Amino acid sequence: MLTSKHEFSLFLNTPAINSKSEKEVISEGPLTTSNEIDVTFSESFSSHLINLRRVPSVNSIIEQEKKGLTKISPSILNQNIAYKEKRQQLFSVLYEETVGYVSMDTLCIAISLLDRCFTVKPTIPTTSFKIYAIGCLFIAFKLTSDYSVAKKSFCENLAPSLSTKNLEKYEKIVLALLNFDIYVISLPSVESFLTPLIFQHVFFKSLPSESCDQMMVEWQYLLVEVMKDCQFIEYRPTEILCASFWVLLEIIWPSAFDFKPFQHLCSLPTNGSADETYIKHSNRFHDLIISIQRIADMLA
């Protein structure tokens, strides 16, 4: 639950007090390396990823992601330094201080809606960040809940000084700005679909359960750091998931896995390997890997 001091630091330009959440404590520590693996496992896993790309649902997800990217402008958002700082601070505080109340899916949808708001209207003053942040978060709660979100409970848990009347006002401001176009396919929702498919491979079933658990913790920690950073908003969720998972495997088992099958899994439809779209995506995926590797290096 956010206390009043956290609310103040979020929305009124006061530096947040550093604290470590339970999630950070669990995930803290260097990404570890392991012994070499059999090349047969590597080749088999590569084939597994290539086959997953043929799953109709994967293609449907990628098409939805493409549409989502058309609703934001990475260049506009990354040029807005004040917005980038407040966005990262909002993500960090909600992630660290609202465990059990704000799900990761809700958080990511709220951030995506906020990105859309500041794309549609880049001139939103810094002093109005609170209005759009709260409005987007309340809408995200509604989108991810199977029940009506109680306005009073929302305010008590996330913005104690806010009245339910103003909460309704903030929600309407966001809805009007976005013309009620609020559908978001979030990274957590894609991850919940894609990860079980990836882990169906016999390679992961052959690992001790504690190794898989640790791998998931380290992957989550890496993903959280990526999602905080505004530089990654130009990438689709499947791209981030595939690139970050390859980076993690590369750290644990250096040079054991080819990155191309991971690239293929998140690739846009093309007419062949020489197609211009394929080449563009290859360069894009390579750049993404390098950026994520930098973050992994800082976490090590």
Swiss-Prot record:
InterPro entries: Cyclin-like_dom, Cyclin-like_sf, Cyclin_N. It comes from the Eukaryota. One of its GO terms (biological process) is chromosome segregation. Gene3D superfamilies: Cyclin-like. One of its GO terms (molecular function) is cyclin-dependent protein serine/threonine kinase regulator activity. Transmembrane segments: none annotated. Has a role in meiotic chromosome segregation. This is Meiosis-specific cyclin crs1. The gene is crs1.
